[in-house]
Amino acid sequence: MSDGNHENRTAWGFLGVRLPLPEDKQWAADQVTILKALGVLDPETGEPTARLEVVKAADLARLTQEAWQTERDKMIKTCTKCHSESYAREQLGMGDKIMQDADRLMAEAIEVVAGLYRDGIIKKPADYAFAYPDFLFFMQTGGAEGAKNLEVSHIDQVLFEMYMKHRMRAYQAFFHVNPDYAYWYGWAMLTKDLGEIKEMAKTMRAVHGGTKK
């Protein structure tokens, strides 16, 4: 964009995930959980699925360290036209940190919903590859048939919005050096989503247990 075109490429890509995984073990585990919810990794084995090729073809994520570093270096070069390099690196590092923190909340929420699938409380839609949340079905959280019949999973919808809307706002706002927006419309909403998901899951488990009796 600094050269006058409208190309918008970043180190973290559209999906906010990357390979290789971060060095921090907890963050790496959280990113793996998110990759499973994107359908890029098999939730049971952790192995890549065919959807990884779709992500590659659409260039939705940086999948090598070199690709990630190339985009980060471009950004630093742009920032240093007005700011010192140390300031630019510090600000970009803050963006990385809020993503790490957001991923902790995101992974916890995914695991809560995945547990409902695992225990049969949420039924796997026929066209889902796995009994697991699937973000790349977008708003069709009951699968194509469920969307047609309006039989969608509400807790999945909240989880999807947490990922696609509030997580993105949290880290993208930091990369735009807008901490106020990142907090109010990103981080605060992420914590709200997680609380709502936990409460809904508790209710769903209680209802399911009562139904079984």
What annotation goes with each model-predicted range?
Residues 1-208:
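Primarily the internal scaffold of c-type cytochrome electron-transfer domains
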